[in-house]
Amino acid sequence: MIVLPGIEVVYERFIDDYSSWGINGFINFDFDGSQAYRFENFEISPFYRFYFSRKKTPNMGFFVQPFISLTQGEYGTYRYDYNDDFYDYDYFEENFFGLAAGALIGRKWVNQKNYVFEISAGVGRLIAKEDEHNYYSDSTAYPRINFAMGKRF
């Protein structure tokens, strides 16, 4: 909520000391679109993580994370009508639904009291789009950058 008016909640379950699976959910609180950092109202994204660490604390250090992402949101767009004698445009608010797949790399630190800090960056690519005429469908790839703090239970 520091950068965006939204919140992301993550659940991660350890498989062993070097891998885990999880799911994260994002809810956007920018209901009127005044910030327009993200068009998604919500996003649900299951993931799998491979950790590359030689330390005694399991599931920390560098990781690679493939993910799938299911999103829904809304955006505003203009539609233009051109002909020889007349020019017109209308403003529409449209809903979208999308499915994306991607990967990211990151690093996770865990202290002795199990507080966690994590940074990651990656890219996702839309693989299913609802409509080829909307802005969201014109963007086929999107960045994914994350700074997270939390507590390991």
Stretches found by the model and what they are:
Residues V3-P5, R38-I44, M60, N95-A101, ...:
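Residues that define the transmembrane beta-barrel architecture of outer-membrane proteins
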Residues M1-F39:
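Start-of-domain marker
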Residues D17-Y18, A36, S53-G61, N111-V116:
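Short loop/turn motifs that connect adjacent beta-strands in outer-membrane beta-barrel proteins
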Residues A141-F153:
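Outer-membrane beta-barrel "beta-signal"
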Residues W21-G25, I44, M60-I68, L99-A101, ...:
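Transmembrane beta-strands of outer-membrane beta-barrel proteins
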Residues R13, F50-F52, R107-W109, R125, ...:
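Residue-level signature of outer-membrane beta-barrel architecture
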Residues M1-V3, F26-N28, F67-T71, G122-L126, ...:
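Outer-membrane beta-barrel pore domains and translocons
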Residues F26-N41, L70-F97, I127-D138:
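Flexible, solvent-exposed loop segments that connect beta-strands
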